[in-house]
From Swiss-Prot:
GO terms for molecular function: ATP binding; metal ion binding; protein-exporting ATPase activity. It catalyses: ATP + H2O + cellular proteinSide 1 = ADP + phosphate + cellular proteinSide 2. Its EC number is 7.4.2.8. The keyword Disulfide bond does not apply. Residues 905-928 are annotated as: Disordered. This is Protein translocase subunit SecA. It comes from Rhodopseudomonas palustris (strain BisB18). CDD domains: DEXDc_SecA, SF2_C_secA. PANTHER family: CHLOROPLAST PROTEIN-TRANSPORTING ATPASE (PTHR30612:SF0), SECA INNER MEMBRANE COMPONENT OF SEC PROTEIN SECRETION SYSTEM (PTHR30612). Its cofactor is Zn(2+). The gene is secA. The keyword Protein transport applies. HAMAP family: SecA. Zn(2+) binds at residues 931, 933, 942-943.
């Protein structure tokens, strides 16, 4: 109560912050007449002036006012668009490294140009992040006109570019691209072997469009670059055949709220019998140690069948299982579930089972975007997640006032008993709206629901068309011109991802009915009457005569203006009180414009708000209403029992709905609970991922420093000496008498690992020899051996071999380490049953694994360099330069190391040249020979185990 009074007296913190920007807005406006008078050349020249001012010691804040004024004038001259005052405020929020919440249609794309231009003046590169390739291309070309006019370069990063094209795009002043492309480029860069092959040039400043979608909705999904493991498709198909025979009532239990499934005791026995009959069970029990991986795959198959639904969680396209983003309804080609779940889904759908992958590199969006020196974002809906955005990213959400007041009517939800009653109500409402040519957008939570609704409309006389088909659209236009409903609808979901921009753009045509999966981050405005740009683009194709083209454009403009008037007048007048005597009937007028109908509530209020926000742009009228049933997922899982009881008490008949603000509040509370739970999950995942992230930064930083060094000889020598110290310390304990030394063990290990037969036993017999002296002699002999190699090969070749072996070995061990961390993370939760904190246990064990990896690195690098020999080619030729190599971005394999240089163990010089990192070059290896990988182990105990 006191807080509400204070807000009325002093304004909210958001109001006060907006007010604080006003003096700078006034200053920008005051500069406008001066800039209007400048020539194009003079306006363009201001970029060089600003850069000089920065070089002279001024800060970006010092030049914000003139820089923003310059961008506004450039936008007027290139795009014919002038930034509103509220857009200037949005630009300031972005520059300060916070989130600007701006309603749909308020021009977020144009707002970004202010902060982008100002920060690009620093010359460090600005990254603008979009949710798909279409928007990246569109915005870079569209806003690039402003930047190009002001003398700045713009690049775009989309799927399918090669490294050279990516380098050129990142070298630009401003780079547009998707969150996925930025993240994958970072991972690929840290798998390369030379600095000049890396494409990114740092992480200075990023503006994330649809920031809530990327930093919250996708935060749980890591970006992973992986390589294939052995093919086990038959095993997955065998396990899948067991699933139909399991009984949900007795064999397993499903918890939809927690999205878990567990086998019952009876289910375990049933599976044991099936596995034994199929010859897949080792030992007597399903839970014997040797069956751990079998249990894991059974559980994944069970999850695939009971928790994952086709056309909701994934679709099958071109014989592949493609994941669907649960929040946006978008397909995510290239993304695969890990831990064998994707293979289980492929077996379930009877498509080709792809081999499991080994993680080569991974990072979450949370950790990727936190690398930027400054991060900001834009969205239409972030206030509901403001706490999370600040807690994790230290980003404050600032609500930017609309340029024109929102005129949309948001009506209370209608709640029905069953899905069929709900669909009947939606159909009736669609028919009423269509009869007055009011465009309708029906939002659904999944592809499955959108297609069910589409079939429902077809049964009742509606025809599905493709909004990208000129013939179909002409029918819709003709009906609108005639003032008649066409009864035509289009479906927008992940299946039609490629046409989504055009379908959305035409959803504002009179009489248009669009069924769409979640509209989060679609990025295309729905303009009443239709999209001028889209129609010009499609209807002027093939017209070469300029006069004819201009005439056609004028016709399209007139058409759209007429359509806009029709949509604005599509109001619904409802009689709320009949006429009595001389007293006229009392009516209620509901606005025209775009009518948003939600077919169910999403778990997140933000997604619902995004759907509502498609209507009412720039002060246009509009309506929104949600139609729900007790059979909807949210209602069913999170407390429909109380509502069902309430509806029963009210005596609700079939087909009747309950409409009350209390229902809305109850639903909002349910959504808040789900949001809080999801926030806790993301926060907990981040704590675990931070452990791996710290190690990742350490490894990647070390890798880059190694690539920067011309020679890693000092590093390699240090690793060699540390490794020898460890061996000697193991066999010659400190302060022990010579009689207590394990001389035989020391000699054997030195010979096994280093390939040197040193007279350690003779040295140990010398009178008065100390352990330090023994260590020094061993190090001297080993150093002499390496010096001889330098003399034999030459310093250039030695530098090349050392760096190649060090980087490749580091990469190999890091990949194995990631697998170990994944396994550790999967089981560490069980420590909670022993009253231990799983996070602390994970930190402790992950650190121990990291230390073991570093120790192994020292051993492996030392062993390989001690044993490797260069076999001269048959014909003399110059050593190839280091730049000649090919990088496989999919697997992370790089053939740069050892390119054109044959390497083989010294004691096998007469055999085929062997590359320690490429088993295909080893040929036949005897079981008791040393493993060619250089580990120092016998082949049968090393790679021979997998042969």
């Amino acid at each position: 109560m006191i807080g509400a009074l204070a807000r009325r007296l002093f304004g909210s913190p958001n109001d006060r912050r907006i007010k604080a920007y006003q003096p700078r807005v006034d200053a920008i406006n005051a500069l406008e007449p001066e800039l209007v008078a400048l020539s194009d050349e003079a306006l363009r020249g201001r970029t060089a002036e600003f850069r000089q001012q920065l070089a002279d010691g001024k800060t970006l804040d010092d030049i914000l006012v003139p820089a923003f004024a310059t961008v506004r004038e450039a936008a007027k001259r290139t795009l014919g668009q002038r930034h509103f005052d509220v857009q200037l405020i949005g630009g300031m929020v972005l520059h300060e490294g916070d989130i600007a919440e701006m309603k749909t249609g308020e021009g977020k794309t144009l707002v970004a140009t202010l902060a982008v231009y100002l920060n690009a003046l620093a010359g460090k590169g600005v990254h603008v992040v979009t949710v798909n390739d279409y928007l990246a291309r569109r915005d870079s070309a569209w806003m690039g006109e402003i930047y190009g006019f002001l003398g700045m370069t713009t690049g775009v990063i989309v799927h399918g570019l090669d490294d050279q094209q990516r380098q050129a795009a990142y070298a630009c002043d401003i780079t547009y691209g998707t969150n996925n492309e930025y993240g994958f480029d970072y991972l690929r860069d840290n798998m390369k072997y030379r600095l000049e092959d890396m494409v990114q040039r740092g992480h200075y400043y990023a503006i994330v469009d649809e920031v809530d979608s990327i930093l919250i909705d996708e935060a749980r999904t890591p970006l992973i670059i992986s390589g294939p493991l052995d093919d086990r498709s038959e095993f997955y198909n065998t396990i899948d055949t067991f699933m139909p025979s399991l009984d949900k009532a007795t064999d397993y239990e499903v918890d939809e709220k927690q999205r878990t499934v567990t086998l019952t005791e009876a289910g375990m026995e049933h599976i044991e019998v099936l596995l034994r009959d199929a010859g897949q069970l080792k030992g007597d029990s399903l839970y014997d140690v040797e069956n751990v991986s079998v249990v894991h795959h059974v559980n994944q198959a069970l999850r695939a069948h009971s928790l994952f639904q086709r056309d909701k969680d994934y679709i099958v396209r071109d014989d592949e299982v493609v994941i669907i983003d649960e929040f946006t309804g978008r397909m995510m080609p290239g993304r695969r579930y890990s831990e064998g779940l994707h293979q289980a889904l492929e077996a379930k759908e009877h498509v080709q089972v792809q081999p499991e992958n080994q993680t080569l590199a991974s990072i979450t969006f949370q950790n990727y975007f936190r690398m930027y020196e400054k991060l900001s974002g834009m969205t239409g809906t972030a206030l509901t997640e403001a706490d999370e955005l600040f807690d994790i990213y230290k980003l404050e959400v600032v609500e930017i006032p609309t340029n024109v007041q929102i005129a949309r009517l948001d009506e209370d939800d209608e709640v029905y008993r069953t899905q069929s009653e709900k669909y009947a109500a939606i159909l009736a409402e669609v028919e009423r709206a269509n009869s007055r040519l009011q465009p309708v957008l029906v939002g659904t939570a999944s592809i499955e629901k959108s297609e069910v609704l589409g079939e429902y409309l077809k049964k009742h006389g509606y025809k599905q068309i493709d909004f990208t088909d000129p013939k179909g659209m002409e029918k819709l236009y003709a009906a609108a011109r005639a003032g008649k409903p066409a009864k035509l609808f289009a479906v927008l979901n992940a299946r039609f991802h490629e046409q989504e921009a055009y379908i959305v753009a035409e959803a504002g045509v009179p009489g248009a009915i669009t069924i769409a999966t979640n509209m989060a981050g679609r990025g295309t405005d729905i303009k009443l009457g239709g999209s001028l740009e889209m129609r010009i683009q499609h209807e002027t194709v093939g017209i070469t005569d300029e006069a004819e083209k201009a005439a056609k454009i004028e016709l399209i403009k007139a058409d759209i203006e007429r359509f806009r008037e029709i949509v604005l007048k599509a109001e619904e007048v409802v009689e709320v009180e009949p006429a009595k005597g001389n007293k006229p009937a009392k009516t209620l007028t509901r606005p025209g414009g775009l009518y948003i109908m939600g077919s169910e509530r999403h778990e997140s209020r933000r997604i619902d708000n995004q759907l509502r926000g498609r209507s009412g742009r720039q002060g246009d009228p509009g309506r929104s209403k949600f139609f729900l049933s007790l059979e909807d997922d949210l209602m069913r899982i999170f407390g429909s029992d109380r509502l069902d009881t309430m509806l029963t008490r009210l005596g609700l008949k079939e087909g009747e709905a309950i409409i009350h603000p209390w229902i809305n509040k109850a639903l909002e509370k349910a959504q808040q609970k789900v949001e809080a739970r999801n926030f806790d999950i993301r926060k907990n995942l981040l704590k675990f991922d931070n452990v791996q992230n710290d190690q990742r930064k350490e490894i990647f930083d070390h890798r880059i420093s190694l690539m920067k060094d011309d020679s890693v000889a000092e590093t390699v020598a240090g690793m060699r000496h540390d490794f020898i110290d460890d061996i000697v310390a193991k066999h010659v304990p400190e302060h022990a008498y010579a009689e207590q030394w394990d001389v035989a063990g020391l000699k054997e290990e030195l010979e096994r690992v280093l390939g040197l037969d040193l007279p350690v036993d003779e040295w140990a017999k010398e009178e008065g020899i100390a352990d330090e002296e023994l260590l020094t002699r061993i190090e001297q002999r080993v150093d002499e051996h390496m010096a001889a190699k330098v003399g034999q090969w030459g310093p250039e070749v030695m530098r090349y071999a050392e760096k190649s072996i060090l980087l490749q070995t580091l990469d190999h061990l890091w990949r194995e380490h990631l697998v170990m961390l994944d396994h550790l993370r999967n089981v560490i939760g069980l420590r909670g049953y022993g009253q231990r904190d799983p996070l602390q246990e994970y930190k402790s064990e992950a650190f121990a694994l990291f230390e073991a990896m570093i120790t192994h690195l020292r051993e492996a690098v030392t062993a390989q360099l001690m044993r490797v020999e260069i076999v001269p080619p048959e014909q003399p030729q110059e050593l190839p330069p280091m730049e000649g190599h090919k990088f496989n971005a999919d697997t992370g394999e790089d053939d740069m190391a050892f390119a054109n240089v044959s390497l083989a163990p010294a004691d096998n010089a007469d055999k085929t040249a062997r590359n320690p990192n490429d088993p295909s070059t080893w040929g036949k290896v005897g079981r008791n020979e040393d493993c060619p990988c250089g580990s120092g182990k016998k082949y049968k105990h090393c790679h021979g185990r997998y042969a």
